[in-house]
């Protein structure tokens, strides 16, 4: 293990030997003293240039640590965060989770919830209105959420939503067929091995 009071500066070059006798060498990107966790930036294992591996090393399982090059100057400043972008993303995530919770509490079928998620991936302007899915304030999809349940003013919005619903159910059906054939294959294999 590393020496009891040892700290590592960000940017320092460190070499260590793990309990599995593996030699690791890299640049310190973070060090948490209470948990004795060291994050090292090492050359990419894939060999790709401009790529690196980040390894988390628990110093409690390291037999030897050597500081090859200690960084004495102050580390570069942390990258700035776009706080408004993060807040917007958090707000959207919250709205999405509340929408899912509403659908569950309203007793919407699993198929309806899955269709809503599929539509929402393509068209963000969709919401629940009781058990109905409302898309772009123009198209309403009522239970059981099939193509024929899509109602609205004839036009491109209605046609586009119908295509999404159609494709969703085609994909669901092909997934069911694939699962059935895999289950049958597994049954055949287990019957042959018995």
Curated annotation (Swiss-Prot):
Residue ranges, annotated region (Disordered):
175-194
Q: Show the GO cellular component annotation of the record.
A: cytoplasm
Q: Where is the composition biased (Polar residues)?
A: 176-194
Q: Which residues form the AD domain?
A: 79-173
Keyword field contains Chaperone: no
Q: What's one GO MF term for it?
A: RNA binding
Keyword field contains Iron: no
Compartments, record wording: Cytoplasm
Give the matching PROSITE patterns: AD, SM
One family name in Pfam for this protein: AD
Alphabetically ordered keywords of this record: Cytoplasm
Residue stretches making up the Sm domain: 1-71
Family assignment from sequence similarity: Belongs to the LSM12 family.
Job description of the protein: Nicotinic acid adenine dinucleotide phosphate (NAADP) binding protein.
Know the name of this protein? Protein LSM12
Species, as recorded: Gallus gallus (Chicken)
């Amino acid at each position: 293990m590393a020496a009891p009071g040892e700290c590592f500066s960000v940017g320092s070059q460190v070499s260590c030997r793990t309990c599995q006798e593996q030699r690791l060498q890299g640049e310190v990107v973070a060090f948490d003293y209470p948990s004795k966790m060291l994050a090292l930036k090492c050359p990419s294992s894939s060999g790709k240039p401009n790529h690196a591996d980040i390894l988390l090393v628990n110093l409690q399982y390291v037999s030897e640590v050597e500081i090859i090059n200690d960084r004495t100057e102050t580390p570069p400043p942390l990258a700035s965060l776009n706080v408004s972008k993060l807040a917007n993303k958090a707000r959207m995530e919250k709205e999405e989770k509340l929408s899912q919770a509403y659908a569950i509490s309203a007793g919407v079928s699993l198929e309806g919830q899955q269709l809503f998620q599929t539509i929402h991936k393509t068209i963000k302007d969709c919401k629940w209105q009781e058990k109905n899915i409302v898309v772009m304030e123009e198209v309403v999809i009522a239970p059981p959420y099939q193509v024929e349940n899509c109602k609205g003013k004839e036009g491109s919005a209605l046609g586009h939503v119908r295509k999404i619903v159609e494709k969703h159910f085609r994909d669901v059906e092909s997934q069911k067929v694939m699962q059935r054939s895999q289950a049958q294959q597994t049954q055949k294999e287990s019957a042959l091995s018995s």
